Structures are given as structure tokens and as C-alpha cells.
Swiss-Prot record:
GO terms for molecular function: 11-cis-retinol dehydrogenase activity; all-trans-retinol dehydrogenase (NAD+) activity; all-trans-retinol dehydrogenase (NADP+) activity. It is an enzyme of class 1 (oxidoreductase). The gene is Rdh12. Expressed in the inner segments of the photoreceptor in retina. This is Retinol dehydrogenase 12. Substrate binds at S175. GO terms for biological process: cellular detoxification of aldehyde; retinol metabolic process; visual perception.
Amino acid sequence: MLFILVLLTSFLSILYLTAPSIRKFFAGGVCTTNVQIPGKVVVITGANTGIGKETARELARRGARVYIACRDVLKGESAASEIRADTKNSQVLVRKLDLSDTKSIRAFAERFLAEEKKLHILINNAGVMMCPYSKTTDGFETHFGVNHLGHFLLTYLLLERLKESAPARVVNLSSIAHLIGKIRFHDLQGQKRYCSAFAYGHSKLANLLFTRELAKRLQGTGVTAYAVHPGVVLSEITRNSYLLCLLWRLFSPFFKSTSQGAQTSLHCALAEDLEPLSGKYFSDCKRMWVSSRARNKKTAERLWNVSCELLGIQWE
């Protein structure tokens, strides 16, 4: 027993000593474009922390007018102040947006449209993960309501401004977790059977299907859409699960930093000549394979229609 303990301790010690090299190996792709975007207007949800914050920082550095759309305005202002100081770009603004409340989403969109005549990049970055069963203000299961329906409604409300500003892009953060996802139309709200991990996977699959269908419907408008897997990133998204927080801390030396996790979002927002790949899924700044469920045209169309029904909107 003592021998096994010593062996395990030695193995973990070696693992942690080599962590910097391992982390560098798994760091993934880097957004290499030098494109500058002065005068461009960007909205990023959940940009008060994590990947979204680093995405906002880089886009501000490149000259964009960046809107941090987040639930916690105080954290948003703190992030914005840091980004403004770091980039010397004063055009980093914070607006209240709670994706678990359709009234908040509509209020954000109404204010933004009154303030801005252009919108060139919309990055649907915010998300929740591994939440105990709960519902949004409007009665939707939290993962499905925030990660999918909230961004679906926001995109719908801002779409005309994107079209008017074309060429424009929509970037939806998905995840490799879509591989465990399944759109269970008979139980979208998870009332019959619920597992937080699968609920997250279902919502990430919904993000991919939404991106696919959105790209199809936007053909010829000058607006393109992309889905992104940022990688396994050390961020606050695990805050709803004690077990995940513990595991994330334990294995944090091997995960991507938030800056590394932002690279694929930046690639899809900035890289030139991506238009032919609208609707596709990217990881480490290159196109990646998706599950057969994520390629199902009928499921994508049905999810679109059901989402419209649940939100009470007409989106042809």
C-alpha cells in the first residue's frame, strides 16, 4: 500500500513538473490575422469574465467599439475599466443583459438599437454549465433557456442591424460536449429526466444546429455565422458545480488560459475569406468535424421552429 502511495505521489509530482510543457502542447491554434477593425461595432455576451473578457480585450485592442453585455453590471464595469486601461481604447461599454429573462434581452436590444446604427460582429459567448435543475424567468430549463433560447432571441432582435452593416458575422460558442447532446423534443425542459451534464450537452448541440440553420437562412445577405469550441479552459463557467470546480482546480495546470480559449472566437470574428465556411464548426482556429446529430437538417429546421414558438416570435 505504501509503495502504491509513493508511486502515485511520484507520478503526480512528475505530471505537475511537466505541466507547462503539456499545457503548451495542448494550447491549440492562434488567431494569426493582423486585421484591424477601427470603427467596427461589436457585441459580446458574458464578456465581464473568462473567454468573453479576453475576446473583448483583443477586439478593443484592434480598434473596435465593444459592448460588454452581461448580467452583473458591476463586474462588467470592472472588466471594461481594465480593458480600456490596457488597450487605450475608451470605446468599451457595458450594458445589462440577463439571458435567463426575455424581458432583459428585449430591453438590451431596444437600447442598443437606439444607440447604434451599425453592428458588425455579434459574439454569443455567455453560458451556464452543470446547473442543478432550475428554470429561467420564462420557465425554460436553464441550460436550454440561457445557452440556446437566450442567444436565439438576441440574434433575432439584432439581425436587421447586422444585415444593414454587412459584411457582418455571428459567432456562437458551442462545445465538444455537443457529442453527448440530443435534442429531445418531447422533453426540452428536462422535466421527465434530468442530468446537468447532458443538459449542457443538449444546449451545445442546439448552438450548432442554430448556427447551421442561421447560416442557411442568411445566404446572400452578407451576414455569416460560425460555431466555436474554445477548448477546455480555466474559467468561471464551472461555478455551478462544486465537483467541477474541484476538478478544474486540480487539473488547471493543463487547461488553456482564457486568452488561449479566446483564439478561435477571434479567428471566426476576424479571419479573412471565411464566408464560404458559414455555418461550420471551428476548434483551434480550424474547421472541425461535428456529430451526425449536429448535421441533421430536419432537426435543425424543427428546432428553429420550436424555438420561435417558445419565444413567441416569427422568424422566416
